[in-house]
Amino acid sequence: MNDMSSDGKKVKSLSDLPGVGQSILNKLIEAGYSSLEAVAVASPQDLSVAAGIPLTTAQRIIKEAREALDIRFKTALEVKKERINTKKITTGSQALDGLLGGGIETRTMTELFGEFGSGKTQLCHQLSVNVQLPLEKGGLGGKAVYIDTEGTFRWERIEAMSKAIGLEPDSAMNNIYYMRAINSDHQMAIVDDLQELISKDPAIKLVIVDSVTSHFRAEFPGRENLAVRQQKLNKHLHQLVRLAEMYDLAVIITNQVMARPDMFYGDPTVAVGGHTLYHVPGIRVQLKKSRGNKRIARIVDAPHLPEGEVVFAITEEGVRDAEE
């Protein structure tokens, strides 16, 4: 990684970039660009307008930030080595981990979609606890951010799940940043602000949005609003993907399903969000109810994983393998 500036100085923050004095630094921070990562993925035009700096200055700063973060063309072999070293978070079920190729991946957005009661929120609660486990136990020794759009977060479940895996409940809850999003604009603003939070607390290794589509559906109903809704949703999803890639963390989004009256065979339900949500997440997992506490998980789309399905269980202690 080339984290040296052109004058040989090691680059750790925006203030280390050549030509970024206190005046420009203040403008960048006030405009919401408080980290190297935020600047590196910005467009020169957006940065120039937002921070009130010349376009040529914005282009130079972005170039320096990208060099510091080693954002460049890579060979397929380098990509292979990165993929092999991808970190994963255990779900609590060996069967479900196996379906996912070892667990929930970092640097990737995973979508969990299914009907009410299919286990989406339970799995999100479990992952926000499991990410805190040490590496040797299937965690990342990290913290979680939980963005709740439907008011379904329950501290009681966090307490029960953390006790079950040997974590002190209050400490586990202290490692989960929680925010209730009241509308779609608030939801997007929270994700915008996450760059600053993650820069201050690099221990954050998991971001959850449960659910990603509910506010967008409620605020933009009908076909006449579809284009605006999809445009906003697409921007929001790409915000989350950038976070996953920039900070090497896992992103989980949940999504609802709706009935398709034109389906006469197979599964008559389809995930909400249309083509926007079909293409952005790296891994798409459908969850379904089964008998009792059992749930079915099925890989719907993942470029590196075979299609398949497994049964797991939701118990008082959390997500576990289903008993035969």
Swiss-Prot record:
UniProt KW keywords: ATP-binding, DNA damage, DNA recombination, DNA-binding, Nucleotide-binding
Cited SUPFAM superfamilies: P-loop containing nucleoside triphosphate hydrolases, Rad51 N-terminal domain-like
Tagged with keyword Electron transport: no
InterPro entries the record matches: AAA+_ATPase (IPR003593), DNA_recomb/repair_Rad51_C (IPR013632), DNA_recomb/repair_RadA (IPR011938), DNA_recomb/repair_RecA-like (IPR016467), DNA_repair_Rad51/TF_NusA_a-hlx (IPR010995), P-loop_NTPase (IPR027417), RecA_ATP-bd (IPR020588), RecA_monomer-monomer_interface (IPR020587)
Entry binding sites for ATP: 114-121
CDD domains registered for this protein in UniProt: archRadA
A biological-process GO annotation: DNA repair
Task performed by this protein: Involved in DNA repair and in homologous recombination. Binds and assemble on single-stranded DNA to form a nucleoprotein filament. Hydrolyzes ATP in a ssDNA-dependent manner and promotes DNA strand exchange between homologous DNA molecules.
Family (UniProt): Belongs to the eukaryotic RecA-like protein family.
Name under which the protein is recorded: DNA repair and recombination protein RadA
Organism this protein belongs to: Sulfurisphaera tokodaii (strain DSM 16993 / JCM 10545 / NBRC 100140 / 7) (Sulfolobus tokodaii)
